[in-house]
Curated annotation (Swiss-Prot):
It comes from the Bacteria. Gene3D superfamilies: Ribosomal protein S7 domain (1.10.455.10). One of its GO terms (molecular function) is structural constituent of ribosome. This is Small ribosomal subunit protein uS7. GO terms for biological process: translation. The gene is rpsG. One of its GO terms (cellular component) is small ribosomal subunit. HAMAP family: Ribosomal_uS7_B (MF_00480_B). It holds the Pfam family Ribosomal_S7. Part of the 30S ribosomal subunit. Contacts proteins S9 and S11. The keyword rRNA-binding applies.
Length: 156
């Protein structure tokens, strides 16, 4: 185990167009091979699609989607007396955001639309309406935690 302690958290600069740190974090999640320009273009095009179709502010739709995706509970494996238990634990706020962004991008990539901006826009709009694969993932995570509620006393 490392003796130095945890690495310091880096401060994320807010996005130049929407002035939001959450948007910057989404761009960072979308980015592949360090191509930030391409990731930014994908996100801004997706936001244009959202604005065109909903007629409302895309950042508002995105924040609504994130609130519907971010999990409150998750399960963590804990070994007690030779058997593993799935122990439900509360998710820390920073991890909630990280998981929400990860699920949003992963399930957007798996969608069937032609271009990535279309996929991302559809997934964000679906999540804002409480449908879509990323919201289903959150519901499944909560169901797992609820099903294993009996092992909550093993929390550490």
């Amino acid at each position: 185990m490392p003796r130095k302690g945890p690495a310091p958290k880096r401060e994320v600069l807010p996005d130049p167009i929407y002035n939001s740190k959450l948007v910057t974090r989404l761009i960072n999640r979308l980015m592949l091979d360090g191509k930030r320009g391409k990731a930014s273009k994908i996100l801004y095009n997706a936001f244009d699609i959202i604005e065109k179709e909903t007629g409302s502010e895309p950042t508002g739709v995105f924040e609504e989607a994130m609130n519907n995706i971010m999990p409150v509970l998750e399960v963590k494996a804990r070994r007690v007396g030779g058997s593993n238990y799935q122990v439900p634990i509360e998710v820390r706020p920073d991890r909630r955001t990280t998981l929400g962004l990860r699920w949003l991008v992963n399930y957007a990539r798996l969608r069937g639309e032609h271009t990535m901006p279309e996929r991302l826009a559809r997934e964000i709009m679906d999540a804002a309406n409480n449908t879509g694969a990323s919201v289903k993932k959150r519901e499944d995570t909560h169901k797992m935690a609820e099903a294993n509620r009996a092992f909550a006393h093993y929390r550490w």
